[in-house]
Amino acid sequence: MSYRFSLAYLTVMDATPPEAVQIAAACGYDHVGLRLLPAGNESPFPLLSDARLLRETRAVLQDTGVTVADIEIVRIGAQFDPQRYLPLLERGAELGARHVLVAGDDDNLDRCAGHFARFCELAVQYRLTADLEPMPWTGVKNVRDALQVIETAGSGNGYILIDALHFDRSDSTLEQVAAIAPGRINYVQFCDAPHIDNPTLEQLIFTARDERMLPGAGEIDLKGLLQAIPADTVLSIEVPRKAEARHLSAQQRAQQGLEALKRLIG
């Protein structure tokens, strides 16, 4: 089976967008993920407004043949206004991106679905999909919640994004993943981590954003997850390792992540 691989932003978060593309090409990735808006309260990333950086990034994409799989990140809260994400969508289209990573911060799932549908209406104008990622500390906590939002929204370009870490630390099951309608998953984020019973909010967020493990080095059932997803799913390596970044370059970390996942696949 021939998989396609994408280098996620968090794996090489210390690299600039052009550097991330170059690293992806050097390591043998097919795609790259780029962050334009922050996950927290930081300022927007330079790629969103810096025309020179956009030109440099597009030039490297063209030179290497690497393509942008996804851009990050849209957060849907109770007061969500999709119009404020127009600059993100426009930039994504200029980069040739395919997917937008979406987080659901509203635990009123019906309201979240309405907002998700409105965002999908905008995204489709830029030939982008909206890929909803359940995270256990957000309003959309698990696979069940995400599917409810997507199905209620009823948008043709609305998809679910599975993150191996969040899958493992929520009450989601492999059976739920395997039952997802064909064509509703574009990509899955792979990493590993130790098993923790009843993790705290701080543990959930710290591991997710700072210290994950290479695929195969922890206790997540990654082989089971591979078997549960469609064969044409893009596999994204999302392995932030801030401690190891002190002595390993971004390219070394990207290479290790890809090699680890390929070993797991066999």
Task: Indicate where each model-derived feature is located.
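Surface-exposed, active-site-proximal loop segments in enzymatic domains
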Residues: N41-L48, V74-L89, E202-R209, A245-R246
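Active-site beta-loop-alpha junctions enriched in small/polar residues
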Residues: A8-V12, R35-A39, I73-I76, G104-D107, ...
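Glycine-rich, proline-tolerant flexible connector loops at the mouths of alpha/beta enzymes
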Residues: G33-E56
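Hydrophobic residues within beta-strands of alpha/beta enzymes
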Residues: V32-G33, I71, V100-V102, A130, ...
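Histidine-acidic metal/acid-base catalytic patches
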Residues: M1-Y9, M13-H31, R58, Q62, ...
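Active-site acidic/histidine proton-transfer and metal-coordination neighborhood
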Residues: V60-T67, R75-Y159, R169
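Alpha-helix-loop-beta-strand connector modules within alpha/beta enzyme cores
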Residues: D50-A69, E121-Y126, I220-Q227
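N-terminal small/glycine-rich loop or linker at the start of catalytic domains
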Residues: M1-S6, T67-D70, V74
